[in-house]
Regions:
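Low-complexity, intrinsically disordered tandem-repeat tracts enriched in small residues
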Residues: 8-10, 27-30
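Intrinsic-disorder-associated, low-complexity terminal segments enriched in Asp/Asn/His/Tyr and depleted
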Residues: 10-13, 21
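Intrinsically disordered, glycine-rich low-complexity segments
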Residues: 32-34
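The feature marks the mature, well-folded catalytic cores of soluble enzymes
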Residues: 37-385
Length: 385
């Protein structure tokens, strides 16, 4: 009996010690995890936050722009002027001397000083999708660039040179922030929108499209987005794909996020328009969307441009594809005075303190994109020593 009592007491003591040990390990693990979260306290800033610079990847004769280079050059010069007057501008191009000769006579002295032309081979011009995505640390302001794989929107187009541009700019010390390798995951900048508070907006049409991250489920992709972008919440939109959009439904053509929990979106009031039903379904999804606290978002509806065609093909013209820079919004126009003016009016409601700068985007839309697609902003912050 004595032996049994001692054995039982020893067994109980052992069990208590084991539980205490497990509890201690859990506390240490949780503490370490918390410290790691604090150390890696990064977030994807909203586009309207202060920027360091914007990247353009200049068109050239060896791209699909060859048939109408003069028209697209004029548009790029207008974008460059608007940007370089307000912040630094990086231009990636395989032909630096040609770009300088074309651009510099059109720039003020201030804009020239703000412009850096970098030698970079390129397949195309869509900086939004091949440039790094920049995070900023919420505590110390340090920057981290995420280098994702760009594969020509699901292997539709050649992208080998474009996929190297960010790393080349980093190697040449033109981009100076720390760069994190995410080349095992396909993601384009035009596929995501951030509110700067931990919520990322995207579309299921794009991220679930073939030849991007094919073997992954939507839930798995969501977890990857949260991990890589340091996001707390992913909002998936399931409607709104524009006719002629070869990105498989980038969110920056249909829905944009603005300050004060405002969502700008492309509307359509013409029931005869082939895009009406899908855009209406998207509108209804946005109306049902709630913030984390249960409140509604402020919704502002942008007009739809009248249908634009090129050789019988409808082009994905949209007013949602604007660029926010320091102190200004650079927005596309389509030579449709009534719609262009209405778009500016709505944008001014979302950005009342910003100057509105109109840029004719008729040349860009011939290649199925617009101003936001052609640019990538780099947020202002500190570079890790």
């Amino acid at each position: 009996m004595f032996f049994c009592t001692i054995f039982a007491e020893d067994k109980l003591h052992s069990a208590i010690c084991k539980q205490a040990y497990i509890a201690l390990v859990c506390i240490i693990f949780a503490k370490g995890k918390k410290e790691k979260m604090i150390k890696d306290n990064y977030i994807l800033p909203a586009e309207w936050e202060e920027q360091e610079c914007v990247q353009l990847t200049w068109p050239h004769k060896d791209t699909d722009w060859a048939p109408y280079l003069d028209d697209i050059y004029e548009m790029f010069v207008n974008m460059a002027k608007a940007i370089a007057e307000r912040e630094r501008l990086i231009i990636a191009t395989p032909h630096p001397e040609e770009v300088e000769a074309m651009l510099y006579p059109c720039l003020s002295e201030k804009a020239k000083e703000n412009t850096k032309i970098a030698l970079c081979p390129s397949n195309d011009t869509w900086a939004r999708d091949h440039a790094p995505i920049t995070l900023r640390n919420r505590e110390n302001g340090e920057l981290k660039m995420l280098d994702f794989k760009f594969n020509g929107w699901g292997e539709k187009f050649a992208a080998d040179k474009d996929n190297e541009i960010g790393r080349r700019l980093k190697a040449d010390n033109i981009l100076t922030a720390e760069m994190e390798d995410n080349l095992d995951f396909v993601l384009e900048g035009g596929a995501i929108e951030s509110d700067g508070k931990g919520t990322i907006f995207t579309t299921s049409q794009c991220l679930m499209a073939p030849h991007r991250n094919q073997s992954m489920t939507q839930q798995e992709i969501e977890e990857e987005l949260k991990k890589r972008l340091r996001a707390e919440r992913i909002v998936w939109l399931d409607h709104g794909n524009l006719v002629g959009d070869d990105t498989d439904g980038h969110i920056d053509t249909i829905v944009r996020i603005a300050p004060d929990d405002t969502i700008l979106y492309m509307g359509c009031d013409d029931k005869e328009d082939e895009q009406y039903e899908d855009l209406k379904a998207m509108e209804n999804q946005l109306k049902a969307l709630r913030k984390d606290g249960g409140e509604e978002y402020r919704l502002l509806k942008l007009p739809s441009p009248e249908a634009i065609y090129d050789d019988g093909e409808r082009l994905p013209a949209t007013y949602a594809n604007f660029l926010i820079i320091n102190g200004a919004v650079v927005y596309p126009t389509y030579r449709q005075p009534k719609n262009d003016a209405e778009a500016e009016r709505i944008l001014k409601m979302a950005f009342p303190e910003h100057e509105m700068i109109a840029v004719d985007a008729c040349a860009a839309i011939r290649q199925h994109g617009s101003i936001h697609c052609l640019t990538m902003q780099y947020t202002k912050g500190k570079v890790k020593k």
